């Protein structure tokens, strides 16, 4: 990949048409480029054979496809694969491929590190190192060896999607547009802790599924483990969500990591049921995966099942999520590239 050239990957149809016109090509060449990119997945401009050789050479002077192959992969005993991809800024980001019988989910990242600093998340301990570009996000799909097997994409990797909303929306547009991947929005879920102003914009502009990181229904307690609560409270989030329809195409879920003795009590179950009353939603209970220097513990299986049963019996559909990739630190809350970046810088491999 030539760092002096502009990547075509990550551009919308309108942007590709503008690139075509700016370089003396007809506007319809933008549509041709989109097909070669998002349908054919070419590696070079030279492969765009329905564009004249002269015009391909003209484009190649300033542009390239821009796809970047993964530079490391870790394989879990359960079939999960964690990939390490380089970014345009020379940093690195992790992506997790999760096969499961007839489904294959890709957990993509949208930032290097994260600003949210949730107590229980390893990514937050890394600090915030920058937003991924639309190209960086899309490259995690474009350059994935198992790309053709994918059935679902979840924005649940490193970073807060609402904190990089322009690029997240741009990527979901390319994924769902006829000129792009032509995926149904039902195949894409975007998670968020809830960011003031940004969550509403996402709900207004996207039809993708929404997953809200709740982790406790009690505002004061949520603020103690999730600083974002102070910007947009869980009660304000729920009131906002009640303004939208989740009874048809778009699905709403709440993510709830279970901490032993902290948020797994009958009181929390009752408060959660009361909080989401009137919302068409589901709750995903998640096992806590221990991270260094954090005084939190996982809830035991019996308490998780009791919590699930209470919610289900009170009309809130609830599941206990199966942990995947824990042996390669690919499970929920474990993604971090801090040590990998430092290691490559020390060895002279940092790009």
Question: Can you name each region flagged by the protein language model?
Answer:
Residues 1-93, 242-250, 258-351:
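Auxiliary Fe-S-binding modules of radical SAM enzymes
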Residues 76, 109-110, 191, 213:
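Short linear Ser/Thr-Pro motifs
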Residues 81, 93, 104-108, 116, ...:
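Generic beta-strand structural signal
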Residues 89-98, 102-103:
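P-loop NTP-binding catalytic core
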Residues 99-136:
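Canonical Radical SAM [4Fe-4S] cluster-binding loop centered on the CxxxCxxC motif
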Residues 135, 139-147:
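Ferredoxin-type iron-sulfur electron-transfer modules in oxidoreductases and energy-metabolism complexes
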Residues 145-152, 157-321:
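Conserved AdoMet/S-adenosylmethionine-binding subsite of the radical SAM
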């Amino acid at each position: 990949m030539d760092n002096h050239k502009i990547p075509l990957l990550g551009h919308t149809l309108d942007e590709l048409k503008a690139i075509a016109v700016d370089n003396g090509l007809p506007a319809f060449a933008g549509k041709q480029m989109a097909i070669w990119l998002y349908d054919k997945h070419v590696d070079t401009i030279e492969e765009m054979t329905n564009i004249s050789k002269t015009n391909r050479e003209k484009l190649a002077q300033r542009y390239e496809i821009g796809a970047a192959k993964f530079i490391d992969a870790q394989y879990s005993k359960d079939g999960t694969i964690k990939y390490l991809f380089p970014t345009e800024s020379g940093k690195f980001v992790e992506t997790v491929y999760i096969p499961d019988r007839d489904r294959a989910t890709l957990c993509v990242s949208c930032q290097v590190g994260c600003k949210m600093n949730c107590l229980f998340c390893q990514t937050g301990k890394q600090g915030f190192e920058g937003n991924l570009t639309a190209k960086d996000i899309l490259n995690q799909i474009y350059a994935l060896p198992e790309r053709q097997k994918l059935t679902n994409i979840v924005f649940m990797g490193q970073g807060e999607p609402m904190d990089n909303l322009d690029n997240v929306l741009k990527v979901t547009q390319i994924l769902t547009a006829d000129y792009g991947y032509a995926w149904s929005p039902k195949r894409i879920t975007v998670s968020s802790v809830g960011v003031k102003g940004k969550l509403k914009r996402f709900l207004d502009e996207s039809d993708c599924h929404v997953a809200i990181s709740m982790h406790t229904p009690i505002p004061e307690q949520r603020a103690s483990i999730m600083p974002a609560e102070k910007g947009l409270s869980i009660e304000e989030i729920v009131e906002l969500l009640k303004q939208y329809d989740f009874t048809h195409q778009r699905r709403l879920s709440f993510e709830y990591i279970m901490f032993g003795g902290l948020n797994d009590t009958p009181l929390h179950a009752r408060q959660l049921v009361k909080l989401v009353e009137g919302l068409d939603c589901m709750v995903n209970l998640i096992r806590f995966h221990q991270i260094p220097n954090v005084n939190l513990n996982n809830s035991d299986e019996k308490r998780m099942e009791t919590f699930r049963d209470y919610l289900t019996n009170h009309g809130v559909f609830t599941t206990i999520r199966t942990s995947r990739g824990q042996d390669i630190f690919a499970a929920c809350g474990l993604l971090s590239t801090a040590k990998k970046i430092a290691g490559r810088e020390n060895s002279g491999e940092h790009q």
